[in-house]
UniProtKB/Swiss-Prot annotation:
GO molecular function term, any single one: DNA-directed RNA polymerase activity
InterPro entries membership: DNA-dir_RNA_pol_bsu_ext_1_sf (IPR042107), DNA-dir_RNA_pol_bsu_external_1 (IPR019462), DNA-dir_RNA_pol_su2 (IPR015712), DNA-dir_RNAP_su2_dom (IPR007120), DNA-dir_RNAP_su2_hyb_sf (IPR037033), RNA_pol_bsu_bac (IPR010243), RNA_pol_bsu_CS (IPR007121), RNA_pol_bsu_protrusion (IPR007644)
Subunit structure: The RNAP catalytic core consists of 2 alpha, 1 beta, 1 beta' and 1 omega subunit. When a sigma factor is associated with the core the holoenzyme is formed, which can initiate transcription.
Gene3D superfamilies per record: 2.40.50.100, 2.40.50.150, 3.90.1100.10, DNA-directed RNA polymerase, beta subunit, external 1 domain (2.30.150.10), DNA-directed RNA polymerase, subunit 2, domain 6 (2.40.270.10), RNA polymerase alpha subunit dimerisation domain (3.90.1800.10), RNA polymerase Rpb2, domain 2 (3.90.1110.10)
Protein name: DNA-directed RNA polymerase subunit beta
Coiled coil start-end: none
Length: 1373
């Protein structure tokens, strides 16, 4: 709630947010970003660009798709359809109406299109404009996002999960030696576009370079280089350096001495300086690059090599005869001994050869000479044959295909991200607008790949977050839109070509159904559009922040290896290392870290504080994984003095590759904002997370999402300080939209008058209608409760009402209960949980679950179905809960089998008897044959009817119940309108009064005469309408009054108009599915108390099932008589290593004891035994300096604050920065307890002390949605399987329990022959036997006969299908 420091009217402290004692040491300089902004920014800001003027819209999202698809021209270029702008109309129904009526919350997309018709002169070919038509065209309804970041599709709330996929760009990797038996590394490169064909380049085991397009058959890489227009000479010159060998008479060849080409080795011949003839090193001596560098520095430029050294080298240009200029050998050819003789014979003085050595291999040259294609045409045709096998090749088709593959922006798109990644990896500077491949790209990809093969550079890590990006909602829907618009483009071109273009309008050309069907399909069936997990507010928020590697264009869970699933150093501060599902999706579905955000390129960024010259400053900078690699980053817990200077000689820092180094303070570039930035929202709610084993923390964060909202919410005594943020951002609580004063409050709504003065001087009124007992997606109950009282001042974004699982604006998933760790008669064996009867009695873990049942009255072939109370063959007793229409009353208590809605269906007429004929002839009535098709409560359900909704088809007369519901809703709307009007009137007339008092009247009314001065008493005698009739002398005052009147009338009209529109919507009838006349929905609420078999869990991954409910008097109790609520097994701790729960228990024990101490002090103060100073001192000791602003207040307010502490002091222990063991001990000491946290406990059954001290404390426990009521069921009689005639299985089929093979063994082991016989026959599939048994039970006899089980007959039939005729013959004895 509103904090004291900025409270205007100094409200009493009761109307205030909860104050927690915080153990955190690190000051937060950055707030947690809005937890659902990832969804809202992506869709509303980047895709739809809602509420942005057309001229100011950027070329992204919907705007960019429409710009790229339009203009559309026909084949002859006569007609041209251009895009002008787009806008959205207001949605027909609001969010609440859509979810009630099972509709999609969507707004109509209106696109303004311009159709230009051209006149083309056939002789000259010149074009003239013949006509232009501009029109707004409806392009279908586009789903809108609700304020909570979800979509409503067909009445259900859905979330579009963000997808992690490999970023477009170029990636280099090797096979890790797995492919070739020798373990040789085979390097490859892959170009991944955003859309278009993939290009792979790869080495084979013989070091020849190949390429593939879309994983088709491989071709030589030089074919690709020739296809982009490179000649042999260009290829060789681009990839190799050249060196010239000069002839030295009778001595050999002189060649330039280049140290970088030399590797360490022993010389096979002398190293001789070519200029002086001096021997530098003898044969057999070792030369190293360092020694070579030394010789170079000493001025050695050329060295002498033997004649035969040239053998085996490759020519770097054509070898020509000096006399005739005839080509003797082509570029790239190897010099053989024969060729060397020719060189000597022709006295060729200079020979240029390629520099090929261990640092630069001959791979490209070898590939060139292996490749048969010698020119561009042959290369293109070869590529064409691979991609289009069986088609006749011609050069035009081949050229067109190759161009379309990589160089046509309509078919190939690297995206801006892909271009940036490509430029940075290849060291290019091509413009970011060029999103197709260029010739430079291809040349350089080959170059980098060859350099990798030569040992230069490193391969890419595909799991690095710089190489994986996030596709959020906006982008996913943008891709669907593009598909839909491309399909629509084809139909537009067809329609342009088909008809007379002169007469058509733009709307005749556009078929919006194509686009709508694609968008609808995405929202209904895509793997990434998911039914929202709405168990509690945390599960909602987590679902919206989820990152999935699965889905279209992503990985498949069967093929994903260990590396993809593993935690990567770049996940730090971006993806939570803890929260991921157990099972086959582990590591593929992740959660974003608390502080992470997604940048415009789709990379996840994490915030860091800047460090300048060893001093930490408050500037926060977000870095992506790529940028982070350039810096040294210290941890958030690095020691810092008051001035922000880093303490210590060395600071532990993270550097690229996830390594840690120790550096001096001035070398540090950034430090983490907070230790909490590493984990996700769910993990950040676990106190003492640092003391838990990772596996258990994973379970803890996952199980918090399964906690069902309880009737009474209770925030944890031991929290982490994040509870308030989660409650606020989840949308479960109601936030004030403006500052204001609370005018009215009840359980259904809150009315707030704002303080903000408008132009007209009248305040606006905000009415917040609260949700009462609504059903969530997971059948839990959504119920909101007001937190404010009349007269309270609230600030914008204050929480004014709690939602499900929230308590005073903080998330509250479970309850604080008193727990003891000790074994108790084996009832807490293997994680079982023993609970006290008090928990059931006081509804501590009771939850409400709401189920929806629907019945549809349809128009059938034989006539309409009817919803009625008049049902054939049903007793009056069965109809007791139904009204005269046949629909159940709200508030009725129902159980399985009760009728909820009476419905009859016409059935085909049976032949009529003569008597009936006579009766019909006399009375003229046709007694319809109808059958009962009423809606009954299914088995296993019981509860109270909380709501009934009736929907009638437009044009169908409404029944009395529908009219009553409608009347109720209209009254509610009228009350909202009247209250708002009343507040506005009150303000307007008080303003008028201020203006009129003291003015002189010009015109007279009955009660007042002209010339009189107006007084307050005089105005009290006038009606509201007469205020406006008064005219006064002051012209300025009259102007002001006129202005107020105009604004007042406008507001009044707007209110009435809004009311009329809503009423019209209610009265107009509903759009129902085809053939439906009426739909009735009944909502039944069931109270689930905690019972044996229910699953419970703590926040540390400690889960168990309730085994027994023990009477309070038998439970262990403390020395003061307090009975323990829950007994847990201490053996569940050591092996699981989630010690956090013990620290939580100890701190919880301190919490309740401190609260008792505070209440004792308050009692003593009230009895005048102590002064306020003693209480102040204790509070200061407990809360520290943070409490000073409360201690400065009046005595009453301090006592009010103490009373508000209630049953426990609230603590916040942030993850990785929370209370240490010593802090917990200090709190226990302050509370007057033993620092061990253990106490003497008395056995409730014997009244004796337990032998040793027991750990007791307050622990936060959750009830999970695995309730025993939804799992266990029993069957008496029910359906049988058609073939085997055995009872069906499973709760949904009302099936039996399978008595399997091992169960049969158990009976055999005990020799229970008769039990076994009846299990296998009459209780299973002996059809005749079970009929006879039924008969004998009805007659009251106790004997039964069993016959042949049906499964035996099935087996015989199977034998017969194998041509074995097995008969069962009875032989007479």
């Amino acid at each position: 709630m509103v904090s004291l420091r900025d409270n205007i009217e100094a409200q009493p402290l009761s109307h205030n947010r909860r104050i927690r004692k915080n153990f955190g040491h690190i000051n937060l300089v950055a707030d947690i970003p809005n937890l659902i902004e990832i969804q809202k920014n992506s869709y509303e800001k980047n895709f739809l660009q809602l509420n942005i003027k057309d001229s100011e819209r950027k070329n992204k999202g919907l705007q960019s798709i429409l710009n790229s698809i339009f203009p559309i021209s026909d084949s002859s270029n006569i007609a041209n359809l251009e895009f002008v702008k787009y806008e959205f109309d207001t949605p027909k129904y609001d969010v609440e109406e859509c979810s009630q009526r099972s509709l999609s919350y969507a707004a109509p997309l209106k696109v303004t299109l311009r159709l230009s018709i051209w006149d083309i002169d056939e002789d000259t070919g010149t074009r003239e404009i013949k006509g232009i038509k501009e029109q707004e065209v409806y392009m279908g309804d586009i789903p809108l996002m609700t304020k909570n970041g979800t979509f409503i599709i067909n009445g259900t709330e859905r979330v579009v999960v963000s997808q992690m996929h490999r970023s477009p760009g170029v990636f280099f990797y090797h096979d890790e030696g797995k492919v070739h038996s020798s373990g040789k590394l085979l390097y490859s490169a892959r170009v991944i576009p955003y859309r278009g064909s993939w290009l792979d380049l790869e080495f084979d085991a013989k070091d020849v370079l190949y390429f593939r397009i879309d994983r088709k058959r491989k071709l030589y890489a030089t074919t690709l280089l020739r296809a982009i227009g490179m000649s042999t000479e260009e290829i060789i010159k681009f990839y190799y350096n050249s060196v010239t060998y000069k002839l030295v008479k009778k001595k050999g060849w002189a060649v330039k001495f280049i140290p970088k080409h030399i590797t360490a080795h022993r010389l096979t011949s002398d190293l001789v300086d070519a200029d002086t003839g001096n021997v530098l090193l003898k044969a057999g001596q070792k030369i190293t690059p360092r020694l070579a560098q030394k010789y170079c520095a000493e001025g050695i430029n050329n060295i002498l090599v033997a004649h035969e050294t040239l053998i085996g080298k490759y020519l770097s240009e054509d070898l020509r005869d000096p006399a005739s200029d005839e080509v003797l050998a082509k570029i790239g050819e190897i010099i053989t001994s024969d060729m060397l003789n020719v060189i000597n014979d022709l006295k060729i003085k200079n020979v240029n050869v390629l520099v090929i050595n261990p640092q630069s291999g001959p791979y490209i040259r070898n590939t060139l000479f292996a490749d048969k294609n010698q020119d561009r045409e042959a290369a293109l045709c070869d590529i064409f044959r691979v991609l289009r096998p069986g088609e006749p090749t011609n050069i035009e088709a081949a050229e067109s295909l190759f161009y379309n593959l990589f160089f046509d922006s309509e078919r190939y798109d690297l995206s801006e991200v892909g271009r940036i990644k490509m430029n940075s990896r290849l060291g290019l500077s091509i413009s970011e607008e060029v999103t197709v491949l260029t010739i430079d790209d291809i040349k350089n990809i080959v170059r980098v790949l060859v350099e990798l093969k030569d040992g230069k550079g490193i391969i890419d890590d595909i799991d690095h977050l710089g190489n994986r990006r996030v596709r959020s909602v906006g982008e996913l829907i943008e891709n669907q839109f593009r598909i839909g618009l491309v399909r629509m483009e084809k139909s537009v071109i067809e329609r342009m070509s088909a008809g007379d273009v002169d007469t058509v309008m733009p709307h005749d050309l556009v078929n919006s159904k194509i686009l709508v069907s694609v968008v609808k399909e995405f929202f209904s069936t895509s793997q990434l559009s998911q039914f929202m997990d709405q168990t509690n507010p945390l599960s909602e928020i987590t679902h919206k922040r989820r990152l999935s590697a699965l889905g279209p264009g992503g990985l498949s869970r069967d093929r994903a290896g260990f590396e993809v699933r593993d935690v990567h150093p770049t996940h730090y501060g971006r993806i939570c290392p803890i929260e991921t599902p157990e099972g086959q999706n582990i590591g593929l579905i992740n959660s974003m870290a608390t502080y992470a955000r997604i940048n415009k390129h789709g990379f996840i960024e994490s915030p860091y504080r800047k460090v300048k010259d060893g001093r930490v400053i408050d500037e926060v900078i977000y870095l992506s994984a790529i940028e982070e690699g350039k810096y040294k980053i210290g941890q958030a817990n690095s020691k810092v003095d008051r001035d922000g200077k880093l303490q210590g000689e060395f600071i532990n820092c993270r550097v690229e590759g996830g390594n840690f180094v120790m550096v001096e303070p001035h070398e540090v570039d950034f430090i983490d904002v907070t230790p909490m930035q590493v984990v996700s929202v769910a993990a950040s709610l676990i106190p003492f997370l640092e003391n838990d084993d990772a596996n258990r923390a994973l379970m803890g964060s996952n199980m918090q999402r399964q906690a069902v909202p309880l009737i009474k919410t209770d925030a944890p005594f031991v929290g982490t300080g994040v509870e308030g943020v989660v409650a606020k951002d989840s949308g479960a609580s109601v936030l004030a939209l403006h500052d204001g004063i609370v005018e009215q409050v009840d359980s259904n709504r809150i009315v707030i008058r704002t303080l903000e003065q408008k132009i007209d001087g009248s305040p606006s009124v905000y009415i917040y209608n609260l949700l009462k007992f609504q059903k969530s997606n997971h059948n839990t109950c959504i119920n909101q409760k007001p937190l404010v009282q009349v007269g309270h001042y609230v600030k914008k974004n204050d929480i004014i009402a709690d939602g499900p699982s929230t308590d005073n604006g903080e998330i509250a998933l479970g309850r604080n209960v008193l727990v003891a760790f000790l074994p108790w008669n084996g009832y807490n064996f293997e994680d079982s949980i023993l609970i006290s009867e008090r928990i059931v009695k006081e509804d501590i873990f009771t939850s409400i679950h709401i189920e929806e049942f629907e019945v549809i009255a349809r128009d059938t072939r034989l006539g309409p179905e009817e919803i009625t109370r008049d049902i054939p063959n049903v007793s009056e007793e069965a109809l007791r809960h139904l009204d005269e229409v046949g629909i159940i009353y709200v508030g009725a208590e129902v159980k399985a089998g009760d009728i909820l809605v009476g419905k009859v269906t016409p059935k085909s007429e049976s032949p009529i008897t003569p008597e009936e004929k006579l009766l019909r002839a006399i009375f003229g009535e046709k007694a319809f044959d109808v059958k009962d098709s009423s809606l009954h409560v299914p088995s296993g359900v019981s509860g109270t009817v909380v709501e009934v909704r009736v929907f009638s088809r437009r044009g169908v007369e409404k029944d009395q119940r529908a009219i009553a519901i409608e009347k109720q809703q209209i009254e509610k709307l009228a009350k909202d309108r009247d209250d708002e009007l009343e507040i506005i009137e009150h303000f307007v007339f008080s303003l008028l009064e201020k203006l009129l008092v003291g003015q002189v009247i010009i015109n007279g009314l009955k009660q007042v005469k002209a010339g009189q001065t107006i007084t307050t008493e005089m105005l009290k005698g006038l009606s509201k309408g007469q205020f406006w009739q008064l005219t006064v002398e002051d012209a300025n005052v009259m102007n002001e009054i006129e202005q107020i009147k105009i604004h007042y009338d406008e507001k009044k009209d707007a209110l009435n108009k809004r009311f009329a529109t809503k009423v019209e919507k209610l009265q107009s009838g509903d759009d129902l599915p085809q053939g439906a006349l009426k739909v009735v929905k009944v909502f039944i609420a069931t109270k689930h108390k905690l019972q044996p078999g229910d699953k419970m869990a703590g926040r540390h991954g400690n889960k168990g099932v309730v085994s027994r409910i023990v009477p309070e008097e038998d439970m262990p109790f403390l020395e003061d008589g307090t009975v323990v609520d829950i007994v847990l097994n201490p053996l569940g701790l050591p092996s699981r290593m989630n010690i956090g729960q013990i620290l939580e228990t100890h701190l919880g024990w301190a919490s309740i004891n401190l609260a008792q101490k505070i209440s004792t002090l308050v009692k003593e103060y009230k009895n005048k035994n102590i002064g306020i100073e003693k209480i102040k001192k204790f509070l200061l000791e407990l809360y520290g300096e943070n409490i000073n602003y409360i201690l400065e207040r009046s005595e009453e307010e301090i006592i009010s604050f103490c009373n508000k502490v209630g049953k426990g002091v609230y603590f916040a222990t942030p993850v990785f920065d929370g209370a240490k063991v010593q802090d917990v001990k200090d709190m226990l000491k302050l509370a007057g307890q033993d620092p061990s946290g253990q106490v003497k406990l008395i056995d409730g059954r014997t009244g004796e002390y337990f032998d040793r001290l027991v750990t007791v404390g307050q622990k936060y426990l959750l009830k999970l949605h695995h309730l025993v009521d939804n799992k266990i069921h029993s069957r008496s009689i029910g359906p049988y399987s058609l073939v085997t005639q055995q009872p069906l299985g499973g709760k949904s089929h009302f099936g039996g329990q399978r008595f399997g093979e091992m169960e049969c063994w158990a009976l055999q082991a005990y020799g229970a022959a008769y039990t076994l016989q009846e299990m296998l026959t009459v209780k299973s599939d002996d059809v005749n036997g079970r009929i006879k048994t039924y008969d004998s039970i009805v007659r009251g006899e106790n004997n039964f006969e069993s016959g042949i089980p049906e499964s035996f007959n099935v087996m015989i039939k199977e034998f017969r299908s194998l041509c074995l005729n097995v008969k069962l013959e009875v032989t007479s004895s």
